[in-house]
A protein has these predicted regions:
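Positively charged n-region of N-terminal signal peptides that target proteins for export
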Residues: 1-4
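Bacterial N-terminal signal peptides
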Residues: 6-16
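Boundary at the C-terminal end of the N-terminal hydrophobic targeting segment
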Residues: 18-22
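Acidic/histidine-rich, surface-exposed loop or edge segments in extracytoplasmic proteins
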Residues: 23-38, 121-124
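Divalent metal-coordination and catalytic microenvironments
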Residues: 42, 71, 125, 162
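A non-catalytic alpha/beta surface segment that caps or lines the substrate-entry region
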Residues: 43-89
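Sec-exported extracytoplasmic/periplasmic mature domains
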Residues: 51, 55-58, 141-150
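Surface-exposed loop and adjacent secondary-structure segments within mature catalytic domains
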Residues: 66, 75-81, 91-97, 107-117, ...
């Protein structure tokens, strides 16, 4: 009986740990699918979702890049292959050197271009009443975080995507008003 109880306990704990590591879908977090009629995510909900994604996915790194006028955190969710996220400083240095292009030879620039990664900036929510922007942003982060098809793997292996929330105050204001 004791062996059975121990086995059952280990099985339940293992399942709990696996479930805890699962990336939550927007529907499971917000209570609706992104794009559902008459449903808007607040910034407070979005912030909590970003934190969950960063906690459970090795493909997401969350950074606070400043404060808004109303004192909210402004986030950048960096999405890429985990090996790229582990070497962010290296790729940042390469990008900065190539952007400034000072005192580097053509050979050095070519080598850095071959070694570096494409950096893509995607922001959402700039104009608060244009609510599709921030919601597609949330869905895009989710899709890049959870999809495991060859095309997504290729994109994440070669690209560092900077998802920046452009207007947290506006999202909170409009979604609460709505």
């Amino acid at each position: 009986m004791r062996k059975y109880f121990c086995f059952l306990l280990i099985a339940l704990l293992s399942q709990s740990l696996l479930m805890a590591q699962t990336v939550p879908s927007p529907k499971s977090h917000f209570g609706f699918n992104i794009g559902d009629n008459y449903q808007l995510a607040t910034f407070t909900q979005t912030e909590a979702y970003l934190k969950k994604l960063a906690a459970v996915s090795k493909k997401v790194k969350l950074q606070v890049i400043g404060k808004t006028e109303e004192g909210r955190n402004q986030y950048m969710a960096i999405v890429s292959d985990p090996s790229n996220l582990a070497n962010l400083e290296k790729y940042k240095t390469i990008s900065q050197k190539l952007a400034h292009a000072e005192n580097i030879s053509v050979a050095e620039a070519t080598q850095m271009a071959n070694e570096g990664k494409a950096v893509v900036w995607i922001d959402g929510g700039l104009h608060a009443t244009e609510v599709v922007g921030i919601h597609q942003w949330i869905e895009s982060i989710y899709q890049f975080t959870t999809r495991n098809d060859e095309e997504t793997k290729r994109i994440l292996a070669n690209t560092i995507i900077l998802f920046v929330h452009a207007n947290p105050d506006g999202q909170e204001l409009v979604s609460n008003w709505y």
